[in-house]
Structures are given as C-alpha cells and as structure tokens.
Amino acid sequence: MDQDKYLSSYDYHLPADCIAQTPAVPRDHSRLLVVKDPFTVDHQHFYDLGNYLKPGDLLVLNDTKVMPARLHGQKENGVAVEILLLTECTENQWIALVKPGKRLKLGAKVKFPARDGEKPDLWATILQRDDATGGRLLEFVLEPGQRLWDVLPDYGEIPFPPYIGDRQATNDQYQTIYAEKLGAVAAPTAGLHFTEELFTKLAQQGVQTAKVTLHVGIGTFRPVEAENILDHVMHQEWIDVPPTTVEVIEKTRASGGRIFAVGTTVVRCLEGMAQESDFPRQPLQPFRGQTDLFIYPGYQWRLVDGLITNFHLPKSSLLMLVSALISRPRLMAIYETAIAKGYRFYSFGDAMVILPEACRGQEKIR
C-alpha cells in the first residue's frame, strides 16, 4: 500500500517545549516559514508576508468567531459538571460534550452559575445521548423568546485547546481581528497572525481580501484512528461562501491573481464550494451548507493556489490536507526543519506559507 495511505506515515515527535502556550506580541511578530518551491524554504517573520505576495493576489479569510462555549456547573447533588457546546438544535436545545458523561444520566438537571455571581443560575436538563458526537442533548431553561446565544456571554468562557495548559493568553488573543460571526468552538488559527497594520500594508501593495465562514467544530480535533486513512470518516462542517466572495475569486482568476487560503478551514470552504459547483467544468456558485470533504495526498485541487497555515498535530487530518498540497515527504521534512530551528507549534504557534511554486506536481482538475 502507498505510504501516503498509512496513518503512521503522518506521525512525528514534537518536544513539549515546542507547543506554544502564548501568542506572539504583536501578532505579526510570529515566525513565518516560507515554502518557496519544491526545494527551498525561507525563514522570516509574519510581517514579511507581503514580500511573497503579488498585486492582484487574493487572501481568503474565515470570519468565524469563537463562542464562549465552555460552561462550568453542578448537578443537584453538588457534583461538578463541565460542558462544551457544539451545535444549536432549537432556541433552547443544544448538543454538548459533557464531563463526567457516565454520571450524567438522562433527566439529570444541571445548574450553571453566572460568571459575575450576580445573575440567576442557568438551568439545563439532559434529554438524550447524541451518538454522532458522544455528547448529550441539553434543554436550557430560558425566558420566553430568548435564545441561549443571548445569555451565553454571562455563563460561558472561551474554550482554549487542551494542549494550552497555563491560560496566560486573553480571550481576544484567541480571536482573529476580523472575527464576526459567532459559532466556532476553536479559532481558525492561521488568521491569528494578522494585524490591522499588516492588512493596510498588503492593501497598499494591491493584495485583496475576501471572506468565507466555517464554524470550527470539535471534529477538527478528533484524531484519525484508521491505519488506512481511506477508511476514515470525515466530520461534517457547515460552510458559507457568499456571492460577493465568489465574484472576487472569479475576478482574481481572470486577472491572473493567485488565491491563497488563510487556514485549512478556508481550504475546506473553497474546495468544498468548488466541488459542489462541479468547477471547473461548471461555473463557481455560492454555497451554504454542509461539507464532509476529506483532502489527502492524491487529491485533485480545483481552486486553491497557495496556503497560509500553522503547524499541525501528528496524525491529524489537517496534516494530510497540507500534504496533499506539497507531498507528505516534503511536509514531514519541513516539520523536522521547523522543530530543529525552534519554531512554535499549534494554535498560538508560528506560521508557514506555501507558495504556488511549491505546489508543482499537485495537479488541478482542468
């Protein structure tokens, strides 16, 4: 079997001190590993990004915003409970991951105190198990006409990834500066490096931006477990590629500009939209809905020319996605170099930009 299909081929050892616990300050002072071509990398800082972009290039951003999805409460008998909200089903019913799951029986009532200690407790009842996520369906007690969204900031906190042990960073540092649409349980971390000053500089250079939405879900962190990655069942995520973004993409392509996805979530949006449109056989169409697109080596690209991304966890579907762009052996060699040179990994870590010239040999559908 081709080595690209083995899960173990995407494993690597990462020393614990390479996992960033705090973000760079300012944001764009993180390091930037530039994959220039199939053989060459540069070592720069994120504020140098413009040196590798051309007038007419397009950066596509994910404007999702991390919601205060983690709530701490207790059962009626005083046992501590923690939940992570995943999906809104109705105005007052949500699917959530719960701890301790085995001790939260159906019908159990949980109260969540307000963060300020002044507002009344928020109550919820465990209705049923959700087999798809391993979580539970909860029904919250709200005022008539009220949604949980309305009160969530009073009771919830931003969920930081589990590999960030000592929470020294602020909530704002775990949001992109262009975050608008509340709904994610994790940040689209490739976008955390951008500052207003950098956007201004890039705009003056003739680099454009456009936005899509993908609310990052818990599926992003679920490990791939099948040794043959072709047996992996990819999680679904809701995406929105609006007409205005499709229009900018078409103009960029027509003028010879290059399309850079800022993060793997944007890759899923753009390639998912292109797949739904049957592009390039048919014109691009705006798309809003679910995608379960799984990108791994051998994938035939439709739209994305280049990628800005962070450094990802071993054996993750995100590592497979990036491997599909520049090949797995090349990516794993780059990761070895990054570790040796002290790059910081994961959500608050450094970034890499993969230029179109580095993607030669990764054929697009014609």
Swiss-Prot record:
GO cellular component, as recorded: cytoplasm
Record's keyword annotation contains Transmembrane helix: no
Catalyzed reaction equations: 7-aminomethyl-7-carbaguanosine(34) in tRNA + S-adenosyl-L-methionine = epoxyqueuosine(34) in tRNA + adenine + L-methionine + 2 H(+)
Metabolic or biological pathway: tRNA modification; tRNA-queuosine biosynthesis
Chief place where the protein resides: cytoplasm
Gene Ontology MF: a single term: S-adenosylmethionine:tRNA ribosyltransferase-isomerase activity
Enzyme class per UniProt: transferase
Family annotation (NCBIfam families): PRK00147.1 (NF001140), queA (TIGR00113)
Protein name per its UniProtKB record: S-adenosylmethionine:tRNA ribosyltransferase-isomerase
Taxonomic source organism: Synechocystis sp. (strain ATCC 27184 / PCC 6803 / Kazusa)
Gene: queA
